[in-house]
């Protein structure tokens, strides 16, 4: 493990001097593609584990990068598109694919079979870890709390995961309304934020499940949500076609960041936003179908945002870069990782010297 950390430190240092001033992908950019060993060049999700490994969920399995080499894994000998990667415990990653959750033992580098009470797979489209033996999941119009444990077999290959639904919550009354994403409230123990395909934002309190709060984000029209983030009193809802919808938790005010708006505070690189992440220094980054956008508070009006759009198709080193960006992950050490639709993974250091 020390060897891995050393490799990643060298990667960071070779990428950029550690000074807290931000640069972006115009010049210093690296690429990982199938030529480097990726399972596929379309990357719907990215995750960094506590040991420093980078995990890329691709359209054809799971890829792990240690800063030097790439190793690929699949739960079966079939074409598997991975939608999400989450930490379930020290040893296990949860891999969401085609509406089902797979367990991957990252220490033993293998997928484990799953057993349920009814021997029927539990369908989930998104997962939120509760602790090292349970998780929240959204399954259609249900919010479920599941508990899991390892069942040790007499032989290692017979070891499996036992999963059971502990609680089920029916929060949606409208026919055809289903959940689309979820995240924790930024204040620990304050609840779970959920979004629906009918444009509703819901704050659910596990201790008082009947007292949930519903906030309409649209006028009843459908809303395709790709991700949700709650930080610094704002819920960021990334969408397809509607840009980013923001809900301010203290005031109840809502605003929208969109493509083609007037003024710096209302501009994105594209209306299809796949993920918005926090990158430090009060800045956020949105990856879209047409590049990415840096969002930051306006100097004169901090409650408003200014934006900088990056959609260059080439740098000093690479030509015809893929600008259809669909996932992102920021390493606090300074590395930004962006997954694309067909162009592999881009990564770059966001730090540079102010003297440069």
Which residue ranges define each predicted feature?
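Carboxylate-rich, polar loop motifs that coordinate divalent cations or form catalytic acidic clusters
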Residues: 1-356
């Amino acid at each position: 493990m020390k060897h891995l950390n050393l490799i990643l430190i060298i990667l960071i240092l070779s990428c950029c001097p550690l000074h807290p001033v931000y640069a972006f992908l115009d010049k210093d950019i690296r690429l990982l593609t199938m030529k480097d060993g990726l399972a596929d060049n379309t990357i719907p999700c990215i995750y960094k584990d506590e040991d420093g490994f980078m995990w890329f969920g691709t359209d054809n399995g799971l890829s792990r990068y240690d800063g030097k080499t790439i190793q690929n894994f699949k739960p079966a000998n079939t074409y598997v598109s991975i939608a999400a990667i989450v930490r379930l415990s020290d040893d296990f990653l949860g891999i969401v694919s085609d509406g089902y959750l797979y367990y991957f033992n990252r220490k033993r580098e293998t997928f484990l079979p799953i057993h349920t009470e009814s021997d029927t797979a539990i369908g989930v489209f998104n997962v939120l870890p509760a602790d090292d033996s349970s998780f929240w999941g959204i399954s259609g119009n249900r919010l479920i709390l599941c508990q899991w444990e390892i069942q040790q077999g007499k032989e290692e290959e017979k070891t499996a995961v036992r999963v059971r639904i502990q609680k089920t919550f029916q929060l949606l009354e409208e026919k055809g309304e289903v959940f689309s994403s979820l995240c924790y409230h930024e204040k620990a123990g304050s609840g779970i934020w959920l979004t629906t395909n009918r444009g509703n934002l819901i704050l659910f309190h596990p201790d008082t499940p009947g007292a949930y709060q519903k906030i309409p984000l649209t006028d009843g029209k459908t809303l395709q949500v790709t991700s949700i983030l709650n930080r610094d009193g704002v819920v960021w809802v990334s969408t397809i076609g509607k840009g980013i919808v923001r809900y301010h938790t203290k005031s109840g005010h809502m605003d929208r960041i969109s493509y083609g708006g007037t003024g710096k505070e209302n501009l994105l690189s594209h209306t299809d936003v796949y993920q918005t992440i926090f990158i430090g220094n009060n800045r956020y980054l949105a990856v879209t179908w047409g590049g990415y956008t840096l969002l930051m508070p306006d100097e004169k009006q901090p409650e408003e945002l200014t934006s900088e759009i990056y959609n260059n198709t080439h740098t000093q080193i690479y030509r015809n870069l893929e600008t259809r960006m669909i996932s992102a992950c920021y390493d606090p050490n300074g590395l930004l990782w962006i997954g694309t639709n067909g162009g592999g993974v881009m990564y770059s250091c966001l730090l540079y010297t102010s003297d440069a």
